[in-house]
Structures are given as structure tokens and as C-alpha cells.
Amino acid sequence: MSYEAVLFDLDNTLYPYAPCNEAGKRAALDALRERGYELDRAAFDDLYATGRRETKRETGGTAASHSRHVYFKRGLSRHAGEPDPAGALAAGDAYWNGYLAEMSLCDGVEAVLDALDAAGTDVAVVTNLTTRVQLRKLVRLGIDDRIDLLVTSEEVGREKPSALPFTSALAELDRRPSEALAVGDNVETDVAGANAVGLDSALFVADGDAPADAELSERQRPDHRLDAFADLTEVAA
């Protein structure tokens, strides 16, 4: 089946997430050590987890829940017993610089984008996180000029699996749900969110194993499973 539009998730869909996250953490730890923090990796991981946990608890469902600068702002305050704005800024900047330096597209992404372009298919990226960070990722991956639209949870005010990121993209592209396919790695935010809107869904996990259908509720089950990103050409183009 061909589609008039494909809505891609970004993180752990177009590129593997885990090595980038690890590179970002190493860079942030180095930045904090340069500022005089005597942290081993275990202490850093505890600081990061504390900041992340507090941020998720208080900002869940918003793009801010993913902000590494907020994680470090809160984590450093708990660790040091007082705020350290400069340290949080340095660690957050170092994290994203290290993260982006490690990024690379999954095999097959460029070929799929070529096929979709040749077929005249609209291509959007619909993603949870802040707009500036996601723009940096698209530029780093070299696909910023290959997509027709970026929609972030920050700009629409709601996170997937809310319908709003999906419907905002469809409205901008002037496409109906029946004309579009959503592709992502997360069975809740990507697959269940797309299914609820009436989009066809495809599950592709760039880094890690996809859960079996038997482990999923009906609303989390994708219409298509992709073992390799290049398989999308047969599904969508």
C-alpha cells in the first residue's frame, strides 16, 4: 500500500538513541569535573537520575520533561545543596554536544527518503522534545532538507500519544489519517497514539528489541513491523 504522507518519529527511529545518550552523559560528566565536581560515574548517574526523576514528576506530558538542562539544574542543586546555574548550563550544553557528535542515521534511511521523494510522498517528523534540540538533530543527520515538516511536542503543547502532534502534522500537510502512515519505535507514544487517530502504524526500533504482539494491548499493536528500516520502501512508497 502506498501513502500520501509518512510521519516519522525521530529518536531511536531514524537513528540509534542509546550510544548518543551515553556519549552525552560522558561529555556532561567531563564538563562537571572540569568545573571542580569530584564525581565518579556512579555519583554522576545518581545525580542525573535524581534530576531526571524530579523533572519527569513535575513536568510529565510536556516537552520540558526531556530537558537535560533541567535535569542538571535540579540534580546539581540536590547534589551540592545549592543552585549552580553555570554548572547546569555547562553540563546541559556538553551533553547535547556530545550526543549530537555520536549521531548517525540508521542504514536505509536515505534510500527510503529517496523512494518517498520519487513517489511524491509528504515526509514529516513528529516528535516529543523541544524544537531547538530536534532541529539540531535534523541538521546533524543531514536530513533537514529532506523533510517537508517538523512538528514537536513543544510547539503544539502536548506530547505523543496525544492526538495533537499527529493531527497538527496532518492539518499542515492537508492529509487525512487514512492517507498517512506513522513510523516509530515506541508502542505507546508512537503506535498507540497513531492508532487512536486512525493512522496506519509501523514499528521500527533502531536500538533494542521490539516487543512481541503477545506482550501488547490491542491499541499498541502496529499494522506493520519493520526488521530493517529499508523494509519501509515496500510498505510506504
Stretches with model-predicted labels:
Residues G87-A91, A118, R146:
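Extended, well-ordered alpha-helical scaffold segments
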Residues M1-V6, A18-P19, D114-A115, D122, ...:
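Asp-based, Mg2+/Mn2+-dependent phosphohydrolase catalytic module
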Residues Y3-E110:
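N-terminal helical cap/lid subdomain that shapes the substrate entry/recognition surface
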Residues K73, D114-D117:
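A broadly conserved amphipathic alpha-helix scaffold signal in soluble, globular proteins
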